[in-house]
Every structure is written in C-alpha cells, then in structure tokens.
A protein has these predicted regions:
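Tandem CBS (Bateman) regulatory domains
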Residues: 1-13, 53-98, 118-159
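A glycine-centered beta-loop-beta connector
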Residues: 31-34, 39-56, 97, 105-121
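The conserved cystathionine-beta-synthase
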Residues: 17-35, 42, 83-101, 108
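Residue-level signal for alpha-helical context at structural boundaries
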Residues: 22-25, 45, 75-76, 111, ...
Length: 159
C-alpha cells in the first residue's frame, strides 16, 4: 500500500499558500491561474492556519453576499484543518477524507506544509495498488490452474 509521501510529486509540492490577510479574490485568482481547487492559509513560518477551497468561495463569499475583493481569508477559510504526514498510508488518508467530506489535504512535516494532495491523487494511487493486487492474485490463481490442467503430452495420451 503506498504512503502519502510516495504520492507527492513536483506538482503536489509546488504549493501555493497565502497569508490570512489575503483576500478571497486573490485566492480565487491564484486558484484559477494554477487550476487548483484549494489554497493553504499559513502564518509567516509556513505553519497551516486553515484552507480556502472553491466551496468556501462559493458558500462563504459569493452566496453569503460578501465582496471577494475585501473579504479576508481569515474570515472565510476552513480553520478546522485535516492534515496528513508523508508516512501515512494512502488508504487511511482516503478513508479520512471521505469521512470528513474533504477533497484536499495538506501534507505536513514538523508543523510545516510541504505539499497538497487531492482526493483524486489519493484515489488514483489506491486504485493502482488494488489493480496490482488483483493482477498478482490472478497470476497466482492461474498458476494453480496450470498445475491442475494436463500438460500437452498428457493430453495427447488421453486422446
């Protein structure tokens, strides 16, 4: 089973983070420019304070009637932040993300964010691992089937 650290590549490590005083408009522009669905909100030392997602933008800014140009991230970010460590199993993180109904998880080491994974990243890895398991089991079973079936010379004798 892959670990979270195995899933981090250059794309996941090229983290974009904003300070809490940044505006929702700045976050929306950064997400649109990078084609990402969330931004980690950090302090000066890179420690995570929260996360701002497309859903936060929609529900807490637009639907709430706030002005994205003046609304600070600290006022609309999700402060209850679920994070993962590179040593955690991808399947465990997937389960936790599904239970919490979240699609993005910051990866944290020593209190600092080193990357971000999406539910899609995690599901791809879990699927690839399960596919590999199925192929291994299939090969194992076929090995037994080959042992049980008569060899070509035995088949000739049967005819």
């Amino acid at each position: 089973m892959p670990h979270v650290g195995n899933l981090l590549d250059d794309r996941n490590r090229d983290l974009i983070a904003l300070r809490p005083e940044a505006t929702a408009m700045e976050a929306a522009q950064a997400m649109a420019d990078r084609r990402i669905g969330s931004i980690v909100v950090t302090d000066d030392d890179g420690r995570p304070l929260g996360i701002f997602t497309e859903r936060d933008l929609m529900v807490r800014v637009i639907v709430a009637g706030r002005d994205a140009r003046t609304t600070r991230l600290s006022d609309v970010m999700t402060a209850e932040l679920f994070t993962a460590h590179p040593a955690e199993k991808a399947a465990d993180v997937r389960r936790a993300m599904q239970e919490r109904h979240i699609r993005h998880v910051p990866i944290v080491v020593d209190g600092r964010v080193i990357g971000m994974l999406s539910l899609r990243d995690v599901l791809r890895a879990v699927l690839a691992d399960k596919t590999h398991e199925v192929q291994a089991i299939k090969a194992y079973i076929q090995g037994f089937e080959d042992e049980d079936s008569p060899s070509p010379s035995e088949r000739e004798r049967e005819d």
